[in-house]
């Protein structure tokens, strides 16, 4: 331990309330401010460069992420050149009753988590979706023909690692050519 201030929390009746502040290693400059309500992240988290300029903004509601993310270069310019989701499908329905969805990114060296499922009330809930990664860079959904009717679409979310270490969320609804796949 260096003896320098690292993080501050405000507590009310034993639970985190208000804004938690994390500092750079010098103990003076603010790295991140995270709002809390009843011990849970709630509101816009703001990250800062050592210069004091805003580095990133992410929003939470009751501990869950909203898709909102803004990141900025050290000169204040918005970052916009993120990797994005690429969807490839393979239709073998007539041959063996399968339909495969492969997820990857347009930038092959960027890591991501891929999930089957969508947002709940506009929020990303990792417990309500199924991780489908087959590597750090791709995910696969193998659907099979069933005797029962099923949804004619699949929802997916890519949780993309940004150059600043945050997670960009990208949602996609993929229409299926058949309504009996599970």
Question: Language-model segments: what does each one mean?
Answer:
Residues 1-182:
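Glycine/tyrosine- and acidic-biased, solvent-exposed loop/turn segments at the edges of beta-strands
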